[in-house]
Amino acid sequence: QKRCYFIKDWDQLLVNMALSGPDLQIYSAEIGVGHFSDFSVTPTCGMATSTSFVGQLDQPRYFIHPGSRQARIVWFTTGYLEYILPNFIPDHSVIEELTVSFEISSEAPRFCDVWPSDITFSLNGVILGTWTSPGDYGDRRGKYNPSWWFSFLNQYGLLKKLTITPEGTFLDAKKLSDVSTGQL
């Protein structure tokens, strides 16, 4: 099995932070998949915008290409992408819940619908948990894929929701770990 960290195949990250109490407020931010602040990736790897690949495929050096900011899909075999998320929460507030929504899958050469890959999620250096992605999907064309996207490449991922609450960390409402908002 491969070990990857936090991302593979997202158009954007949708982050919601909810405060508790009578003044409940929700702060949201949409972060493009190409807006990572640090990375370490190994081939097979690459990025693409809605109109073309960013640089050359399987060349990690293109992850610093200026066009990476417009990426709509990112993939790599092993490694990580790190994001700096905006924090609009007022000082001395208590975060009740943090939710991150994304599309994700494994990364296999070309694609392989059965390709288990461990993906570890972390926040502020704290490991939230590991989930095993079942595959890298190419059995049908992706709903939003551009016409130029090759049919022999990954076509879509799974829509996932990572939620951190006072009770722990959950992926699609299934407990991933005991790491809570209070520990972050």
Model-derived regions, located:
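Enriched - but not universal
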Residues: 1, 13, 78, 134, ...
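Residue-identity detector for glutamine
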Residues: 1, 12, 25, 56-59, ...
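Basic, Lys/Arg-rich alpha-helical nucleic-acid-recognition elements, primarily the DNA-binding modules
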Residues: 1-18
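Short N-terminal segments
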Residues: 2, 18-29, 33, 154-156
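Generic hydrophobic, helix-prone segments enriched in Leu/Val/Ile
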Residues: 15, 95-98, 159
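Mid-protein regulatory/catalytic core that forms ligand/cofactor-binding pockets
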Residues: 23-146
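Short, surface-exposed tryptophan/glycine-enriched loops
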Residues: 141-184
